[in-house]
Amino acid sequence: MKSIDVFCHLMPPEYAKICMAEAPNKSHMFVRALNVASMSNMDARNEVLKAFPGYKQIPNIVSPPVETFAGPDKSPRLAAIGNDEIKKIVEANPEFYEGFIAGIPFNNVKASVEEIKRAKDMGAKGIQIYTHMNGEAIDTEKYWPIYEACEKYDLPILIHPVGGQMVPEFPKENRSKYELWF
């Protein structure tokens, strides 16, 4: 039986290096992802995947989103690099991957619309956004062109939760027990 796991995270090492250079204040997030072997070392990840015949993934890039550490002038380039890198991984390993979920520079609406079209042309299966844009509601009217582009190019939107270690999933917890934000 074939199973497809949608929205499983990975961190392309080249993308992480570029982002850490751009945003040293967020380096801890990239280092954390790089220290999870199956998230950043594709040989290690593929070894795990080999153990599950018929299982494939449609991966996306793990947090943090580019809009949290790059302004609207730099985030488009970083989102494009991330999408290029994840596409390379998927194309190099078709036995494990059915496609990828693309990231967009949500803090630059015009560039997001352009990246959505490019993602469609690249074969992306969907677009990843986060539950808020640096504290702002994602249903704000200025973001509607992003949703219209996803509709136009028939790309589903997958919404990634945003929080952090100190933001619990449940009211009676003091911190995130399951790290759903990561």
Residue ranges and their predicted role:
Residues M1-F182:
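Helix-coil boundary/capping segments in enzymes
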